Swiss-Prot record:
Keywords: Ribonucleoprotein, Ribosomal protein, RNA-binding, rRNA-binding. This is Small ribosomal subunit protein uS3. It comes from Nitrosospira multiformis (strain ATCC 25196 / NCIMB 11849 / C 71). PANTHER family: 30S/40S RIBOSOMAL PROTEIN S3 (PTHR11760), SMALL RIBOSOMAL SUBUNIT PROTEIN US3C (PTHR11760:SF19). Signal peptide: none annotated. Gene3D superfamilies: 3.30.300.20, Ribosomal protein S3, C-terminal domain. Belongs to the universal ribosomal protein uS3 family. The keyword Aminoacyl-tRNA synthetase does not apply.
Length: 286
């Protein structure tokens, strides 16, 4: 079922982390969750042209901390920080608590799944051919270090009457492997023919240990016994006596029945039998 489950939710607490980090009791949980959804929708509309890939919401005691990951942080901050102050005021009204806004830059937007999906959606809204947009995004991702990428588009592609689904893949995209660092993003393109959905999977490598990538020349972490306990070793397969008996290097050889020491002497003293000529016994018998 690797194709059906959400790749990020499948890898939570293994490789991925939650986008909302806070705790609440049963009564206040629905309201806080609704606030998070409204904040994300507001930021998606407000920062549509700022290339926002991810939004992380944290709630310390009676405060809120929002971290925005963007490939264009200058667009979010604005001139002398004017835009970010307006954004902070709007978020405080929306959440009802003091809000701290942090901006983090995405170094490689070409291998960020959400940014790839948003970019393809913007191109489809500008009437660019969907195959050209998908293949160009795949080439850029593979050129900048992605080990695999898969892009799927669904809807009335090119304005046809019957909706269909097309997808392209390059490299490896292991959906079932938990240690695979798989990035996933979804976006929608609102065209004149209807809504076209875009899904993107980007495989960045396998994580072996703590932040170690496969093929980096480091071995996998070994599991050691607790302190104070002796190491359990595998018992020997053969007893020590049998191993010593066969240490002469003749183990496995088949040995015949033992002969006495006098057998060689007897064979030397016995006279050899003369061969019987054919026809002598026949004449005597006649």
């Amino acid at each position: 079922m690797g194709q059906k489950i959400h790749p990020t939710g499948f890898r939570l607490s293994v490789l991925k982390n939650w986008s909302s980090k806070w705790y609440a009791n049963g009564k206040s949980f629905p309201g806080m969750l609704n606030e998070d959804i409204k904040v994300r929708e507001y930021l998606k509309k407000k920062l549509a042209h700022a290339s926002v890939g991810r939004v992380v919401i944290e709630r310390p005691s009676k405060n809120a901390r929002i971290t925005i990951y963007s490939s264009r942080p200058g667009v979010v901050i604005g001139k002398k920080g004017e835009d970010i102050e307006v954004l902070r005021g709007a978020l405080q009204k929306l959440m009802g608590v003091p809000v701290h806004v942090n901006i983090e830059e995405i170094r490689k937007p070409e291998i960020d799944a959400q940014l790839i999906a948003d970019n393809i959606a913007q191109q489809l809204e500008k009437r660019i051919m969907f195959r050209r947009a998908m293949k160009r995004a795949m080439q850029n991702a593979m050129r900048l270090g992605a080990q695999g990428i898969k892009i799927m588009s669904s809807g009335r592609l090119n304005g046809i009457e019957i909706a269909r689904t097309e997808w392209y893949r390059e490299g490896r995209v292991p959906l079932h492997t938990l240690r695979a660092d798989l990035d996933y993003g979804v976006s929608e393109a609102k065209t004149t023919y209807g809504v076209i959905g875009i899904k993107v999977w980007v495989f960045k490598g396998e994580v072996i240990g703590r932040g170690e990538q496969a093929g980096a020349g480091t071995a996998a972490p070994q599991v050691l016994p607790p302190a104070g306990e002796p190491e359990t070793r595998r018992p020997p397969r053969r007893p020590a006596g049998r191993a010593d008996a066969r240490s002469d290097g003749k183990a496995g050889e088949k040995k015949g029945p033992r002969k006495s020491d006098n057998s060689s002497e007897e064979s030397a003293t016995k006279p050899a039998k003369k061969p019987v000529k054919p026809g002598v016994n026949d004449a005597a018998a006649s």
